[in-house]
Amino acid sequence: MSAYEVLVSNITQSFLDHGYEAMTMSKLAKYCNITRRGLYHHFSSKEEAFQAMVRQNNQRTRLGSLSEGTRLLSAGADVLDIVTAVLDVRYGDTRRKLVLSPFALEVNDYAFRLCRPEMVEAATVFQANFAALLQQIIANGQLTLRPTISIETLVQLLCDGARGTNQSFFAPSSEEITARYRQMSQAILFGCAEPAGL
């Protein structure tokens, strides 16, 4: 990790431990073990630091999820295992980290308030990458889409389902979230497609 990535990781932990509203740049510098001047060299405000946190997390989970999906595809895993793993890393890692924070609702609220452009961009890039991975699965003969469903529609449904799982009123615990992604993925996949050869 670069020094900047380490700083943003420390910023992430600081917001999770202390919340957004009461945070100041002075406190953030102290929690990150950096001078205020050093922090201001990178960010002009706590809002910018928070946005950097969201960007880095989105990049980390996007790359990690696609790496895991590609690894499973190469290992010959079935489509449900691949899709579950991709969604679990992309959305579940953040959820598991957030539920440990006493400021989870506050951090989540500010992420939606302050970081919508970053979140939309991350979703757009991830969904295009996820579609490419699913195209490989289809090309391998592991999945056949129904004629009325496009790959983009399938990806949108799966991602909406994962985000909905995270935001549901009866949200699963950290231990249950992988199974919930699997159940949701199975319902969507085999309502939109059928296993190849059937």
Range-by-range predicted roles:
Residues 112, 123-158, 192-197:
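Hydrophobic alpha-helical bundle segments that form small-molecule/ligand-binding pockets
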